[in-house]
From Swiss-Prot:
Substrate binds at residues 156, 182, 193, 280, 404, 409. The record marks 119-120 as: Involved in the stabilization of negative charge on the oxyanion by the formation of the oxyanion hole. The lineage of its organism: Bacteria, Pseudomonadati, Pseudomonadota, Betaproteobacteria, Burkholderiales. This is Arginine biosynthesis bifunctional protein ArgJ. InterPro entries: Arg_biosynth_ArgJ, ArgJ-like_dom_sf, ArgJ_beta_C. Its main location: cytoplasm.
Length: 409
């Protein structure tokens, strides 16, 4: 049950010159559902990405890293759902490379110019013959305005397709950005079962784009959590086609750099928050804001401790203002020299804990009033510095257990 999340209108998603998207129903895991996405990328585009930090990273992640490092330039993306091709060893790597060879043959490009992605069940062999059989159909229906269908084609336990568009102005000219994401469970920073793809018609040097991708990921996909599990397949990739006719951004000091950085990060945040809003069984969307830390990392450490806590998440599901659980999470977050007498806690505008203890003016009915809302902000002030960090998360419901217990059935 998604929290204040609906599918976007297809005509609200902006086509990006130099990017075509096509899909197919290949029967990877289930029949009669979109499960293959093919993205054609114009020659000369810059492409950059960041990937899961899980040591058991999937075969397609390994191949993507190799192909991006080859310097040949990415010309296509292929995504399958229903099977993660993870925990599959050398045979899985061979199947990922076979997929790239099939796409390359279809499009007349080199296999190293294809970036493969998979999402779904781990530890099962990829049915590569079905995937390859679906590629001609995906190639045949590829077009620039297929963003909504593309979002539908990468869904697993998602209940809503996730896509968004935005614009910015660079050197006086309009620039477009469009993107899709997927994910609902096994979501934790760096990165989780999340796939995110954004395309823009801005003109960006590839090395500069890599820095922009890292910045956007740190402030979006690496700032969300659903259940604290880090997946094997997470990937976030940005394509810059250069078709907008703007000057090439070749350094961080370029006058257009900040505007593109902010637009890209804003769109990535929107896509990442859609994942949390569609968290498996979610009924609440929570913003965890920690301020007054000595560093951003310290603030994030505290925010993640609160956001990952099953006791905190189930309290929010029940609308039970058992808010000592939040203070307990702050206490075990690992800030060893934290002076708890300086910690303050708010739920929206309700001041719950003051100077390390219960605020004398706090009334439990006020806390419960906030916790009954679908969207809640938890604000924690550490009182030891000027740094801040924000993490987005959701609650744990009975449906989370049911969805994951039934996932393979």
């Amino acid at each position: 049950m998604a929290v204040n999340l609906v599918a976007p209108a297809a005509d609200s998603l902006l086509p990006i010159d130099g990017v075509d998207l096509g899909w197919a129903e290949a029967g990877i895991r289930k029949a009669n559902r979109k499960d293959v996405l093919l993205v054609r990328i114009a020659e000369g585009a810059s492409v950059a990405g960041v990937f899961t930090q899980n040591r058991f990273c999937a075969a397609p992640v390994q191949v993507c890293r190799e192909h991006l490092a080859s310097g040949q330039g990415a010309r296509a993306i292929v995504v399958n759902t229903g099977n993660a091709n993870a925990g599959t060893g050398a045979p899985g790597l061979a199947l990922a490379r076979q997929t790239c060879e099939a796409v390359a043959g279809l499009l007349g490009i080199a296999p190293q110019q294809v970036l493969p992605f998979s999402t779904g069940v781990i530890l099962e062999p990829l049915p590569v013959d079905r995937l390859i059989a679906g590629l001609p159909a995906a190639q045949a229906n590829a077009k620039p305005d297929n963003w909504l269908a593309a979002a539908e084609s990468i869904m697993t336990t998602d209940t809503v397709p996730k896509a968004a568009s935005g614009t910015c102005t660079l050197s006086g000219k309009p620039v477009r950005l469009s993107g899709i994401s997927k994910g609902a469970g096994m979501i934790r920073p760096n990165m989780a079962t999340m796939l995110g793809f954004i395309a823009t018609d801005a003109n960006v040097d590839e090395a500069v784009l890599q820095g922009l991708v890292r910045h956007a990921a740190d402030h979006s996909f690496n700032s969300v959590t659903v259940d604290g599990d880090t997946s094997t397949n997470d990937s976030f990739v940005v394509i810059a086609t250069g078709r907008a006719g703007t000057p090439r951004i070749d350094s961080e000091s370029h006058p257009d750099y900040a505007a593109l950085r902010d637009a890209l990060t804003g769109l990535a945040q929107a896509l990442a928050q859609k994942i949390v809003r569609d968290g498996e069984g979610a009924t609440k969307f929570m913003t965890i804001r920690v301020e007054g830390g000595r560093s951003v990392d310290e603030c994030r450490q505290v925010a993640y401790a609160v956001a990952h806590s099953p006791l905190v998440k189930t309290a929010f599901y029940a609308s039970d203002p058992n808010l000592g659980r939040i203070l307990a999470a702050v206490g075990y977050a690992g800030v060893n020299d934290l002076d708890v007498d300086g910690v303050n806690l708010w739920l929206d505008d309700v001041w719950v804990a003051r100077d390390g203890g219960r605020n004398p003016d706090y009334r439990e009915e006020d806390g419960q009033r906030v916790m009954k809302q679908a969207e809640i902000t938890v604000r924690i002030a550490l009182g030891r510095g000027d740094a801040t960090a924000t993490v987005w998360t959701c609650d744990f419901s009975h449906d989370y257990v049911s969805i994951n217990a039934d996932y393979r059935s």
